[in-house]
UniProtKB/Swiss-Prot annotation:
Family: Belongs to the polyphosphate kinase 1 (PPK1) family.
The organism of origin for this protein: Campylobacter jejuni subsp. doylei (strain ATCC BAA-1458 / RM4099 / 269.97)
BP GO annotations: polyphosphate biosynthetic process
Function in brief: Catalyzes the reversible transfer of the terminal phosphate of ATP to form a long-chain polyphosphate (polyP).
Protein name as annotated: Polyphosphate kinase
Catalytic activity reported: [phosphate](n) + ATP = [phosphate](n+1) + ADP
Amino acid sequence: MQTSPDMFINRELSWLRFNSRVLDQCSKNLPLLEKLKFIAIYCTNLDEFYMIRVAGLKQLFSAGVNASSSDEMTPLQQLKAIRKYLHQEKELLEHYFNEITSELEKENLFIKHYENLDENLKQKCDEYFFSNIFPVIVPIAVDATHPFPHLNNLSFSLAVKIFDKAHPELVKFGMIRIPRVLPRFYEVSANIYVPIESIVHQHAEEIFPGYKLLASAAFRVTRNADMVIEEEEADDFMMILEQGLKLRRKGAFVRLQIQKDADEQIVEFLNTHMKIFHKDVYEYSILLNLPSLWQIAGNKNFTHLLSPLYTPKTLPPFDENLSIFDAVEKEDILIIQPFESFDPVYKFIKEASKDPEVISIRMTLYRVEKNSNIVQALIDAASDGKQVTVMVELKARFDEENNLHWAKALENAGAHVIYGITGFKVHAKVSQVIRKQGDKLKFYMHLSTGNYNASSAKIYTDVSYFTSKAEFARDTTSFFHILSGFSKNRRLQTLSMSPNQIKEKILEMIRIETSKKNKGVIVAKMNSLVDSDIIQALYEASMEGVKIDLIIRGICCLKPDEEYSKNIRVRSIIGKYLEHARVFYFKHSEPNYFISSADWMPRNLERRLELMTPIYDERSKAKLAQFLRLQLSDNVLAYELKNNGEYEKIPSSEKTIDSQQTLEEYVSKIYKTLKKDTDQSRATHLASKLFKEN
């Protein structure tokens, strides 16, 4: 099949539409503070998009690159389309923010500027300024002897226009840098938040004594945050990375956010020094630095304005009183997070660190929380003399510094730490424990779609798989040998790994379904679909009658509902949990269910070490089947992709199905039922039965 550029949706525009779906949660019947969270998430996402994707397009344009995507849009065309899209959507963001804050006021929760406070609260703000703000803020003069300062990425400041009271004709410009150690809002009372810049503005003349304030404007800068590291030339990769992190702070300016109706001379002053293209200047009639809205959303006095808190459940065959290794030795176990608890994953490593029969623990780490119990368990194991091998991916974007910290801590404890593979990121999520049983060695494995991160495990949907099967032991051992040693053979037998096998295996399974024509079925759930070869193979399958359902949270470059894709349906699910699992079903393959750390993107399939895991266990396959069925039935959180690249909400029928809420209810029902049943084998059977029935 010959493809053409018009058969693909532009990657960057597809991502923008994903983020629009995040913002669209503000239009739904959600608790107010949940809506505020979605605004924070939307703005955080946009920050990263500008730091990496827009910055990259600017570099391509500067280098004279004409085409950089499957749809053959040039970097300049993409930049123009992005700016147009975001300037239009800015008005929608402002609308939702004003609407939500207005509704919050009806609930007696306020964001108020200094000038709108009563005298008592103003006095409290004044006291807070002198005790907490004044000692740490940085007043900056800009003139012939004071050059324009370095502004960190995403730094928040107040630009000022002032004049000398003794010489009113001498207008000067400067700024007040607001350090990140200060909270975004001052909680002046239990229900009133004052933006920090509002207090600083009020006291600007005390910050610049002897000067009169003419105007001020809050602004925020975004820099290019991508890092290019010459790994092949690095003798000490950790040192090179630390240098790269320092250079990142000095990346080129790519965006300026500033309050609307700012003094024209202030805007000109900033533009002159930052040299930001005028279309990358965004003026807001609402507050800036909205990722910090989490501070308000976390107010303990207004939990009634949040969704009810769900507690993940641990289901059989896992049991508090049973060794996790005994459970895994009896059968393969699959859990779906965060509906089922992440605790067994932690217990897997914790128990291994304490078990005297365990001689080796191996693990990959990509994104780890700052206070990680899992990494602490690895440190304890290494300190006790166990052989601990940890692949810490130092190139995990925006987690580099945290990963550096843990890599050093593990190394100091005696663990063998691998920093990565030259030219690749290691994105696979896998751990292996080896125990002595008499004169034999027994292997236990955990493979996952998500990170070893207890914090994200509460808000990401992911799939974890525990097994002690020999074929998985063989392949995980080979995988860790590839990571720690030299190997030209990067192929496994049961597992598939990228960059050599996963794409090849996926294309092979698509071809099998294509050969079955209208009896073929493919269901694939992932974060993003970009790879043009896989998209072309799906088009060919569709034209042969294969029924294809794709559940893609984010980027999708495939165009559904065309002559060549009339049998392909694409949906995206956006809810309170971030859909992060990658689950694939190919009806006529054997096995036919897979989980993976990899999306169907060139970066995952060609430039990362990833794993795709076949699922053989019938109970686990039944769970995955139910999981996919629920998501394909969702008419509350789901959006459907149209052939013009736009997404439409799935029309609700009389029976509404929220796949995330339904799974919460299913697992809670199972848990409640099982609490009454003390027979372990019967309880496990009941858990499986309930998953199938529901």
